[in-house]
Amino acid sequence: MSDYILELEEYGVAFGEKIILSSVNLKVPVVGNIVLLGPAGIGKSTLFRSVCGINKANPSFRTWGKAKYLGDDLDNQLETPALVSQNVKLMMSSILENVVINLPERQSLQKAQQIDVAKRLLERANLHELTERLDDNVIDLSLGLQRHLAILRTAVANPKLICIDEPTTGLEEDYVEHLLQYISEESKRRAVITILHNQEHAKKLEGMVALLSDGWIHEYSIDKDFYNEPQSKAGKQFIKSGSCPVIGPEYDEEALQYMDMDLIELPPPVPKEAKEYVSDALGPRNFLWLKNGILAGTPQPGIVADIDYDLKALKKVGVTKLITLLEKQLDPEPINNYGIENLWFPIDDMQAPDINEAIKWCKRVEKFMAEGEVVAYHCKAGMGRTGTMLTAQLIWEGMAALDALETARKVEPRWVQSETQIKFLEDFWSAVHDLKDNCAL
């Protein structure tokens, strides 16, 4: 048995031609805490989403190098690291439901037993104040309590590795220490990697520190060594200023003449595999599969790129039905010219549809998929209304509301954008549940 639960060797990630991570080397012990630091926007979240298997929903996603989890190739594992996404908010259902949803033995427990287990888990997580509020809706809790509960909910499933993305961002300082203490306690039971930007917050998590920039790990050391005496140029700059110069994995050599090379360590050469890229069916930017090759969400064609480029990309991934959720109908002619049928189901921005209308559309989409059609929903950005209807489809097919939202947000954490949409999904589940119960009578 290896001493490491996750081993990355020359691991890289790209989306199409865009290389985000070029050559990451990292070994994660079976138990303990690692803080992942680095400038904003350089791929820390991408690393998490890649090793947790979430980026596979993007048809342009590709990797190279070696990634081993639990001693075997990461791609061969049914179990993956668990992710607590960046800026967790707009959670659904009651406190009780969130605590017990991932319990392996949940189905064998009576309601009273579930309540007893939930209270014990909340106590262990230092969420004592919630033990007598099990029926309260999570969406009504403070942001700090929502983040805390999201980590507990993930830990309840007993994953071997939890990746926590910026848990303290936007929190009141008086709650930060409480949350970090809980993360420290979890790291005594399993491996935990936490992305943080605030160094003072990072220093409260004892363990290892990894500094990621320009597509590779510049430094990986014991926390006190890193904060007191960093060895890399990037580490010294990060401790001094909270950031470090960024040139990217594929840097422009001409641009280097305008930079202070005393502050910069050139990244390793981009591996040959990273450059061996042949364009295939990639889909538009931010296109994501909820069901691979069957059901997807995407932004409005023409919003991110030229409309013909986006429509050609939709055709390449096989989309045959494009459902528009905008208030105003699109011109169907250019869409039809690519062999894609455009359908229109108007929903106001940040709002939710009528329940009966949503049921009709879920029935239609279910029929489309059964007939071999490939369906994509879109609103403007492909997030709120799109995520709501995709989640509704999962509910229509039999998932509980919270399970459906969790499944959708594992693909795109920003799917479902408003309290109105959250409330709709809960009401939609009740309506579908009642409808199918009545049909069974």
Regions found by a protein language model. Give the residues of each.
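ABC-type ATPase nucleotide-binding domains, specifically the catalytic core motifs of the NBD
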Residues: 53-57, 97-114, 124-126, 398
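A short, proline-enriched helix->beta-strand linker immediately N-terminal to the Walker B motif
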Residues: 156-160
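A short, surface-exposed alpha-helical micro-motif characterized by mixed small hydrophobic
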Residues: 202-204
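Conserved beta-strand-loop-alpha-helix hinge in the C-terminal portion
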Residues: 216-239
